[in-house]
Amino acid sequence: MKKKLVSLALAAAMGMTLLAGCGGSTGSTGSEAAGTSSTAESAAASTAESAAASVAEGSSDLASAKVGVCIYQFADNFMTLFRQELESYLVAQGFDKGNITIVDGANDQATQSGQIDNFIADNVDVLIINLVNSSSAATVTDKVVEAGIPLVYINREPDADEQQRWTDNDWNVCYVGCDARQSGTFQGEIIADLGLDAVDFNKNGKIDYIMIEGDPENVDAAYRTEFSVKALTDAGLEVNCLDDQVGMWDQVKGAELVANSLSQHGTDIEVVFCNNDAMALGALQSIQSAGRKVGEDIYLVGVDALTEVVQYVIDGSITGTVFNNHFAQADGAADAAINYLTGAGNEHNIQCDYTKVTADNAQEILDSLS
């Protein structure tokens, strides 16, 4: 019940170029992200309402529908939560669990492409795909559309040009996810809200930070990197990037990179930004091994609100994170699939909001995840 309350309470808004964390801006703005909110909220609400009506009216025999789900990598903490919720929600809506097939792309696009080919050969009724590489979207879209199968992309957003093709051709293709610009903005705001005096341990008048990025081909990584720093500068704070490395969303890699940065830059590092919580957990290990203490001589923020990380926020071991609402996203993806199967159709971009997680609301978020 709690997770459903989270889905209902937080479902709302969302939206490419790669930037290094020490680099400049694409020209996108925070207000640009915020400006999509009302449209996205309307699309999300419409999708859910249409799906609920279809289920209530029994307009389609969902139990006999075959659903193919491609996840980029089962080892990803967040996508584990996502796929578990997706399967649970699909079954709750009337799908037969035996007709839901979820496969692991093992973070290899060639592997995932073969899995998509297999689903097409198996004549699945709808495909839900978490791409290994967002740049492969056009190729994937073409083969799935040619096969006459509705397609729901999740988590990794295809670029604007690709999404425009869906609109121009009126294809049964959509994306369900959150606006990563918002997650980056929230990360930066968590630090900015502390104030310069609290963060500027070396008293040089700047926020000295390191950035641990996710996948260089992933738009979420690009936006989180850019907008976390932009939130600081928008708050009037001067920033200094000491290091920017790619951790590929991995906890072990995150620990290694942060350990190296701490060895090189020592106490000059005041903030560690991580594009996801897995890497933040790795960063925490290295911070503690270096004899540093979050909240006393360094700050650490992530994204996803994994249960372990939220508990660390409560304990004060991690400064904050951003709740990447897997309930709303997974349920929204399932609702979109239902709408395609029942002929209701969807908007091409269906979005939901992130939630900033600090010591002030971490217990509430943790309770909702239980």
Could you say what each language-model-derived stretch is?
Residues T17-G21:
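C-terminal motif of bacterial Sec signal peptides marking the signal peptidase cleavage site
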Residues M1-A12:
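Positively charged n-region of N-terminal signal peptides that target proteins for export
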Residues K2, C22-S370:
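A residue-level marker of the well-folded mature domains of exported/periplasmic proteins
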